[in-house]
């Protein structure tokens, strides 16, 4: 009898030890992910493609589906411009990543207010929210347009300070143990530079510096007019896909993605000591199946600046048009967009001329003062002049307004000029 009890006890120990190293690692129950494609419209195909691909990678690595929260407008897969109805691809191999993706927030629910509510676990978001606690690790991935101090959503913008304040709230309320953020957007570094504390267990990387464009890739598909991926996003997703994440650190991925994303300068912010941690703590620890990557990932090609994509996509639609009527209509639209681009440029030049007559402040603003100023100024500019969602190319000019705030000009003076120029 004694030997039977002893044998059962030993067997239990062995089974527990085996379970700790099984593919369904119990530790994966303490991982949460929030994936955000912040755009809509077929010319922004790549953002939803990035999120769909990332979703499948996290699932394959062991993150529980109930712990993945997705934001996607969901207007791409069944878009009339999509020659492959019901499918979304992320490179020229045309592997469908849309199938199986559970979208928690779509359409008008893809907005900054709901996003911040989800992060805080606020049930007023109306759907799945982050329920992480002090022992949980969180991964946030965002892809869309950006400008200094903002990330764009379909109808509104997320400003840097409210985002950083939300992250601080999560820390104060012990809503995570460690948190990692990846951001794909033009000027994405401006969301964190000088703003993200280095002592709250948050590690962030961005596709670009605070003052440069990010890049799209796979932009010349023979049948799809839009770009299929973002360069930084595709690089990190494929890097996670092909490696065993229990043996690959955050810094190893950062350095590899920085090397591969050779058209912009990938940046790193926050607690850089976290770079020694393994990716498995945030993206899952399951071993890849032996057949999972028989076909090696594609090398990104045909990359262009994100700001040039609206015109690039329109040029490709003209080339792919099946009849002269469609081609003529698209040519007219192209002409209007080129005129709009010139109008934006002229508008910013006139604003510069008016600002020349405003007395220059004696000292520059602090980073906090700059962010407070630019939030007010951007809202006025988008109300009176142009919205990012209507004219993504304005992101290349908004740095002008940011620079005025940075130099210490008051939001009141800048907005006074904006009203003179744009009415």
Curated annotation (Swiss-Prot):
InterPro entries cross-referenced by the UniProt entry: AE, Legum_prodom, Legumain_prodom_sf, Peptidase_C13
Cellular component aspect of the GO annotation: vacuole
Signal peptide range: 1-18
Tissue spec: Gut.
EC number: 3.4.22.34
Purpose: This protease is used by the parasite for degradation of the host globin.
Name of the featured protein: Hemoglobinase
Species annotation: Schistosoma japonicum
Lineage of the species this protein comes from: Eukaryota, Metazoa, Spiralia, Lophotrochozoa, Platyhelminthes
Gene: HAEM
């Amino acid at each position: 009898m004694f030997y039977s009890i002893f044998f059962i006890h030993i067997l239990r120990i062995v089974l527990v030890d085996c379970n700790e190293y099984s593919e369904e690692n119990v530790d994966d129950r303490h991982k949460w992910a929030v994936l955000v494609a912040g755009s809509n419209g077929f010319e922004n195909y790549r953002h939803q493609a990035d999120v769909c691909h990332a979703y499948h990678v996290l699932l394959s690595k062991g993150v529980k589906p109930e712990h993945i929260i997705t934001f996607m407008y969901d207007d791409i897969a069944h878009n009339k411009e999509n020659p492959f109805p019901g499918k979304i691809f992320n490179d020229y191999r045309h592997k469908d990543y849309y199938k199986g993706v559970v979208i928690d927030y779509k359409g008008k629910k893809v907005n900054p207010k709901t996003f911040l509510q989800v992060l805080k676990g606020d049930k007023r978001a109306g759907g799945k929210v982050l329920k992480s606690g002090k022992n949980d690790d969180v991964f946030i991935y965002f892809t869309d347009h950006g400008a200094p101090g903002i990330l764009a959503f379909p109808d509104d913008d997320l400003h840097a300070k409210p985002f950083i304040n939300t992250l601080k709230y999560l820390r104060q309320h012990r809503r995570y143990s460690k948190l990692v953020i990846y951001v794909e957007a033009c000027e994405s570094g401006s969301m964190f530079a000088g703003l993200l504390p280095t002592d709250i267990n948050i590690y962030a990387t961005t596709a670009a510096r605070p003052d440069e464009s990010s890049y799209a890739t796979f932009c010349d598909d023979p049948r799809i007019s839009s770009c299929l991926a973002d360069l930084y996003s595709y690089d990190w997703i494929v890097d996670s896909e092909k490696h065993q994440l229990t043996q690959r650190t955050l810094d190893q991925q950062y350095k590899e993605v920085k090397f591969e994303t050779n058209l912009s300068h990938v940046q790193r912010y926050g607690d850089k000591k976290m770079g020694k941690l393994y990716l498995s703590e945030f993206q899952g620890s399951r071993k890849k199946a032996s057949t999972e990557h028989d076909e090696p990932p594609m090398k990104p090609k045909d990359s262009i600046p994100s700001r040039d994509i609206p015109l690039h996509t329109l040029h490709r639609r003209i080339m792919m048009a099946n009849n002269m009527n469609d081609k003529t209509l698209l040519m007219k639209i192209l002409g209007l967009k080129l005129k709009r681009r010139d109008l934006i440029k002229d508008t910013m030049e006139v604003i510069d001329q008016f600002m020349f007559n405003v007395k220059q402040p004696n000292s520059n603003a602090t980073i906090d003062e700059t962010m407070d100023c630019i939030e007010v100024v951007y809202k006025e500019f988008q109300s009176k002049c142009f919205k990012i969602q209507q004219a993504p190319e304005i992101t290349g000019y908004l740095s002008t307004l940011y620079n005025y705030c940075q130099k210490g000009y008051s939001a009141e003076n800048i907005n006074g000029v904006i009203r003179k120029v744009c009415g």
